């Protein structure tokens, strides 16, 4: 069996929408018995009182049960922001009807599959930016893609993907026309990544829209008959050729809970 293509997401979902990080609050150093505090210094607060009020500087515990069992790719660190560059995809009602048909059939093979909440096509891996890098990073992106025009693309090939750690599996629709435009955009995004000493995109990327996902490596169940049957549903769906044709009109960068849009000309 050939290796499944990789997706460029972090393994965590909702937590990436907020600042990543947890920092341990430095403990107060104790004094010798009977030693007076120096002028201007506060007396140390007893531990019994400190434990009544947990430090607000400490980040949340990374509980995978709270985000569908997903495992974080990189650890929380205060001041680090998970960052992703992509083209958003606005799903029409007919697209969601097709998605429902695909998901219903795929769940007969892998019942734990769930639908994606939003749709996009990745132009980068998920990387970590320091907070003070965000605006310079976004400005560099804007400068790099300023000359690009909107373009049409088609996504009508069903494909199974995993993340790098093989902790999540995705059902996606691969780009079958417009691939060269995506490569040109990735080349510019990669140059920005290199300027900030960040990971570039995959060498031979498979541009796609992820439709559904599940925890774990489900390739064995989904490749073969399941994949062929899903492709049949797409091919036979009414007006699927027109339905799965779309325009790339903007590039978006998500960094923590911040979104930056860069319209194409």
From Swiss-Prot:
Q: Which GO terms describe its cellular component?
A: intercellular bridge; nucleoplasm; nucleus
Biological processes, Gene Ontology terms: RNA splicing; snRNA 3'-end processing; U6 snRNA 3'-end processing
Name the Enzyme Commission number(s) assigned to this protein: 4.6.1.-
Q: Which UniProt keywords apply?
A: Hydrolase, Lyase, Nuclease, Nucleus
Keyword presence, DNA repair = no
Q: Does the keyword Hydrolase apply?
A: yes
Subcellular location(s) of the protein: Nucleus
Q: Which residues cross the membrane?
A: none
Catalysed reaction(s)?
a 3'-end uridylyl-uridine-RNA = a 3'-end 2',3'-cyclophospho-uridine-RNA + uridine; a 3'-end uridylyl-adenosine-RNA = a 3'-end 2',3'-cyclophospho-uridine-RNA + adenosine
Q: Where is this region: Disordered?
A: 1-67
- Enumerate the SUPFAM superfamilies for this protein: LigT-like
Recorded hits in Pfam families, A to Z, give: HVSL
* Skewed-composition ranges (Basic and acidic residues): 20-32
Which positions are annotated as binding UMP?
A: 164, 202, 206-210
* Uppermost EC category: lyase
- Indicate which residues the UniProt annotation says bind AMP: 120-122, 202, 204-210
Q: State any single GO MF term.
A: 3'-5'-RNA exonuclease activity
Which sites are catalytic? 120 (proton acceptor), 208 (proton donor)
The family classification in the record reads: Belongs to the 2H phosphoesterase superfamily. USB1 family.
PANTHER family, A to Z: U6 SNRNA PHOSPHODIESTERASE 1
Q: What does this protein do?
A: 3'-5' RNA exonuclease that trims the 3' end of oligo(U) and oligo(A) tracts of the pre-U6 small nuclear RNA (snRNA) molecule, leading to the formation of a mature U6 snRNA 3' end-terminated with a 2',3'-cyclic phosphate. Participates in the U6 snRNA 3' end processing that prevents U6 snRNA degradation. In addition also removes uridines from the 3' end of U6atac snRNA and possibly the vault RNA VTRNA1-1.
Quaternary data: Interacts with PLRG1, CDC5L and PRPF19.
Listed name of the protein: U6 snRNA phosphodiesterase 1
Q: Which organism is it from?
A: Bos taurus (Bovine)
Task: List the taxonomic lineage.
Answer: Eukaryota, Metazoa, Chordata, Craniata, Vertebrata
* Name of the coding gene: USB1
């Amino acid at each position: 069996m050939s290796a499944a293509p990789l997706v460029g997401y972090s393994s965590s979902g909702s937590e990436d929408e907020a600042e990543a990080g947890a920092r341990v609050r430095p403990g107060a150093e104790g004094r010798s018995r009977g030693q007076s505090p120096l002028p201007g210094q506060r007396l140390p607060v007893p531990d019994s009182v400190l434990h009544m009020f947990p430090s607000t500087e400490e980040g949340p515990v990374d509980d995978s049960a709270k985000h569908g069992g997903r495992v974080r790719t990189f650890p929380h660190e205060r001041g680090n922001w998970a960052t992703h560059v992509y083209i958003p995809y606005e799903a029409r009602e007919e697209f969601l009807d097709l998605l429902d048909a695909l998901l219903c059939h795929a769940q007969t093979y892998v019942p734990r599959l769930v639908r994606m909440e939003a749709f996009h096509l990745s132009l980068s891996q998920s990387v970590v930016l320091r907070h003070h890098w965000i605006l310079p990073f976004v400005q560099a992106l804007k400068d790099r893609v300023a000359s690009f025009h909107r373009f049409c693309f088609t996504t009508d090939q069903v494909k199974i993907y995993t993340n790098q750690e093989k902790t999540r599996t995705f059902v996606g629709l691969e780009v079958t026309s417009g691939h060269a435009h995506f490569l040109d955009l990735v080349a510019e995004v990669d140059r920005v990544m290199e300027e900030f000493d960040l990971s570039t995109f995959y060498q031979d990327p498979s541009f796609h829209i992820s439709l559904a996902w599940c925890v774990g490596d489900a390739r064995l169940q989904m490749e073969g008959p399941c994949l062929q049957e899903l492709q049949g549903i797409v091919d036979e769906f009414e007006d699927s050729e027109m339905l799965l044709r779309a325009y790339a009109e903007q590039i978006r960068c998500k960094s923590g809970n911040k979104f930056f849009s860069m319209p194409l000309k």
